[in-house]
Structures are given as C-alpha cells and as structure tokens.
C-alpha cells in the first residue's frame, strides 16, 4: 500500500490524467442518483376587464396598459420556472373565471404557453362588469375540476365595477382551500382614466364616474346576482373616472381567504412569493451526475496544463 502511494505521489501527472479519464468514462455511462424534489403547479389567472386597459404602467420606459404589463410579467415569470413545473392559464371577467387549459409542463409546452399569452386580449371578456371579490369563489370552483392540485396566482388591479356596497359585498368566509393562493396587484397608485374601445380597438372615450355606479334599482336585485352598471362615457376630462390599483381591497380580500398579496411591479418579489407557495406534490426524480463528473475531469485537466500553474509548481 505504501509503495502504491509513493508511486502515485512521484507520478502525480500520470495519476491525475488517469483520474480524469476514469471520470470521463463514468460520465459517458450517465449515472444518476435519486433526489426528492418539489413539483409546483400554478393556475395563473389574468384579469381582462376594461380597467386593465388603463395605461399607467411602463416597460423599458414605454407606457403600456395594465394588461400588457401583466402579460410581460408573466412571460418573464414563466421563462424562469424550472422544468417539471406546470402552468395553467385562466381569464377573469364579470364574476367568472374560465380555464384555458389544465396546468402543463412549462418546458415541454413552452411555445404553446407563450403563444397563448401573446393572444390574451381584453376583447375576450364576456361582460363589462368586474367583480373581483366574487371571482374568488368562481376560481375555487374551477380548481375543483383540475386533475391535480394547483396554486392560484391571480393578476388583477382589484377594480370593482360596479362599486361594492353592503348589499353586494360577497361573504368569503365559506371559501375553502385558498390558503396558498397569491393575489398580484397590477396598476399604479396614481391611476388613470379607463378607456372605452370598440370591438376593433378604436377609442370611443373614457368611462365616466356614473358608469362605475350601480344602475337605479340595483339594490333589490343584488341577491339575485343581476347587478348592472350604467354605460356612460365621460363628457369631459373632469368627468372621467380614474382607476387606481385597489391595493387595500386586495390586501383585505387576501387576508379574509388566507391568501398572500404582492405587487406585480417587482419580478423578484413575485418570484419569491410564488416560491413560498406550497408544491403540488413531492416526488423522487433522477439527478444526472454526468455533467458533474465531466466538470471534475475538466478541472483536473485544466489544473495540469495551465501555464501559470506549471510556473508556480516550478518554483516549489
């Protein structure tokens, strides 16, 4: 044994080359070890109501609507998710949430997910109303039809149209399973008028203050879910309704249902909040060692042949 150690010490270069060769051969065999990892599944819901057309956000210095900003933020977020993560997309309008598809693997379906995001449009909305609070119940109903658990990430400005009153504020105490959800606030605290477009995206004007109120006689029919609002355009700049990020109401709603809240203007804050959400499940998966072995072999070879290293060894 002592003789072998002496030989290896006296023939260090040969020994290291042999080790590098062994590591490369092992790397070619693609060995792996089982590791336990968390699998995350997200249901990303996008508010496509008309207040999301408000232009009070910016991307690289360019003013954009809240909806365009949401899509941009989702592109960034999805691109950063590791393979194995599943993502499903949904749209919110009125009181309802619809699922475009169940959560699918981000790597295997990356192009399809990105293409779907690119085509999200406010004109897909099926009503002009925006009842964010009630949509929490609708979201839970959608999740019940999913083949496996998923965590909700709900992007919205929190704008309620028509405005909430005591008779049309839905009690959320009966909502079950929302403890891991994440509400993401989109919009500025300064706000801007809500544009009203034609179905060809031509600007007609801006929603008035009156348009955000309940239509006459709405209180008696609130319980029946038949609330409507006025459809008035602002006659002048002073009459335009300014929509701000309803952060306080979203924070209150998140607290009521046991969810978390974060602003969407920070990618890092959003990613951190999503990482804190509970995984859909845990599973054992193979971790390939070939890259680790190949890297180790490469470092050995670099250590042997770098001129500066040989120079240092020459002074010893």
Q: Can you describe what each PLM-predicted range is?
A:
Residues 86-119, 142-143, 273:
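Short beta-strand-loop
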Residues 32-50:
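Alpha-helical transmembrane signal-anchor/signal-peptide segments
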Residues 158-243:
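VWA/integrin I-like adhesion module and closely mimicked acidic/polar interface patches used
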Residues 56-66, 76-77, 99-104, 120-129, ...:
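Second-shell loop/turn segments in exported
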Residues 39-40, 52-86, 105-110:
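…and closely analogous acidic/polar surface helices at protein-protein or active-site interfaces
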Residues 41-43, 253-293:
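Juxtamembrane amphipathic/hinge helix adjacent to a transmembrane helix
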Residues 1-37, 275-316:
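C-terminal signal-anchor/stop-transfer transmembrane helix together with its immediate cytosolic
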Residues 24, 47-49, 89, 139-143, ...:
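DG-centered beta-turn motif at the end of beta-strands
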């Amino acid at each position: 044994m002592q003789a072998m150690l002496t030989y290896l010490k006296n023939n260090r270069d040969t020994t290291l080359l042999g080790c590098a060769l062994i590591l490369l051969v092992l790397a070619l065999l693609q060995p792996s070890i089982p590791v336990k990892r968390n699998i995350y599944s997200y249901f990303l819901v996008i508010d496509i109501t008309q207040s999301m057309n408000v232009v009070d956000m910016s991307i690289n210095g360019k003013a954009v609507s809240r909806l365009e900003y949401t899509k941009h933020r989702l592109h960034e977020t999805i691109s950063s998710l590791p393979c194995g993560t599943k993502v499903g997309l949904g749209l919110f309008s009125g009181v309802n949430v619809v699922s475009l598809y169940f959560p699918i693997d981000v790597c295997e379906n990356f192009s399809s997910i990105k293409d779907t995001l690119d085509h999200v449009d406010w004109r897909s909305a099926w009503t002009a109303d925006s009842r964010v609070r009630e949509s929490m119940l609708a979201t839970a109903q959608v999740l019940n039809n999913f083949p496996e658990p998923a965590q909700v990430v709900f992007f919205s400005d929190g704008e309620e149209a028509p405005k909430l009153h005591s008779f049309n504020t839905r009690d959320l105490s009966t909502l079950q399973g929302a403890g891991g959800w994440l509400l993401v606030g989109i919009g500025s605290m300064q706000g801007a008028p809500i544009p009203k477009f034609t179905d060809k995206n031509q600007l007609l004007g801006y929603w008035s203050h009156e348009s955000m109120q309940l239509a006459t006689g709405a209180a008696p029919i609130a319980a029946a879910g038949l609330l409507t609002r006025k459809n008035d355009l602002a006659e002048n700049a002073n009459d335009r309704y300014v929509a701000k990020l309803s952060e306080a109401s979203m924070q209150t709603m998140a607290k009521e249902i046991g969810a978390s809240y974060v602003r969407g203007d920070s990618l890092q804050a959003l990613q951190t909040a999503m990482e804190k959400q509970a995984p859909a499940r845990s599973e054992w998966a193979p971790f390939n060692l070939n890259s680790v072995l190949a890297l180790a072999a490469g470092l050995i070879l670099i250590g042997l042949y770098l001129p500066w290293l040989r120079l240092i060894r020459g002074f010893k």
